[in-house]
Amino acid sequence: MSTSARDRLIVGLDLPTVTEAEKIVSTLGEEVLFYKIGYQLAFAGGLDFARDLAASGKQVFLDMKLLDIDNTVAKGVENIVKMGVSMLTLHAYPKAMKSAVEAARGSNLCLLGVTVLTSMDEQDVIDAGYEYDPHSLVLRRAEQARAAGMGGIVCSAEEAAAVRKIIGGDMALVTPGIRPAGAEKGDQKRVMTPADALRAGSSHLVVGRPIVAAPDPLAASRAILAEMESALSR
């Protein structure tokens, strides 16, 4: 796994239009190599943009959080492989993960199991009908993802150290909810700074609003990369 901060920082293009996303990518230039595209942008022309971004040499994390019957998940993954993106999320349900792994076999697509959304706290998990607290549910799903042959896990930085012990050193551990010191949490409930997340065992950090909504996105990305480089060099 690369030790470069630029290979580990994923900028979340949580924007309403492709035009705005293109502007951010242009502004960040060669400073940022990896971008995340989720529902908001995907359903506004972002899937074609994802193909173009991947074709241009950038890495793309397609955050679709797939979950459906086995065959539907498999067919979806087969077509996503053709897009040339680097990462894809699906909810960490055993049958869905096994189908996705088989569909992606032989490709370079890294499949990520989503454990528990970083916007959820213990009450949210209870309200959703689970008997586990968020931490226990994350660990259970991490083990299931490892057993299914997934390429990595998505979890909050709070669980990163415990998850890393379960999945070992080879799987990716992607952490959203990253906020530089002093930044607003927004709708995230389980957050951590870039340096602390890396020290906890995260391999990739997803940063959205602190960069794309910053007065100077390029300066914001450079500050976060510097913090990451400092943490990685220790």
Swiss-Prot record:
The UniProt keywords, alphabetically, are: Decarboxylase, Lyase, Pyrimidine biosynthesis
Q: Which family does it belong to?
A: Belongs to the OMP decarboxylase family. Type 1 subfamily.
Q: Does Protein transport count among this protein's keywords?
A: no
Annotated source species = Rhizobium meliloti (strain 1021) (Ensifer meliloti)
Q: Which Gene3D superfamilies match?
A: Aldolase class I
Q: What is the annotated quaternary arrangement, including any partners?
A: Homodimer.
Q: Quote any Pfam family the record assigns.
A: OMPdecase
Q: Does the keyword tRNA-binding apply?
A: no
Q: Which residues bind substrate?
A: 14, 36, 63-72, 118, 179, 188, 208-209
Enzyme Commission code(s) on record: 4.1.1.23
Identify the pathway.
Answer: Pyrimidine metabolism; UMP biosynthesis via de novo pathway; UMP from orotate: step 2/2
List, alphabetically, the GO terms of the cellular component aspect.
cytosol
Protein name (record): Orotidine 5'-phosphate decarboxylase
Give the main EC class: lyase
- What residues sit in the active site? 65 (proton donor)
Q: Which GO terms describe its molecular function?
A: orotidine-5'-phosphate decarboxylase activity
Cited function: Catalyzes the decarboxylation of orotidine 5'-monophosphate (OMP) to uridine 5'-monophosphate (UMP).
Q: Which domain of life is it from?
A: Bacteria
The record lists the catalysed reaction(s) as: orotidine 5'-phosphate + H(+) = UMP + CO2
- Check the record and name the InterPro entries matching this protein: Aldolase_TIM, OMPdecase, OMPdecase_AS, OMPdecase_bac, OMPdeCOase_dom, RibuloseP-bd_barrel
For biological process, the GO terms are: 'de novo' pyrimidine nucleobase biosynthetic process; 'de novo' UMP biosynthetic process
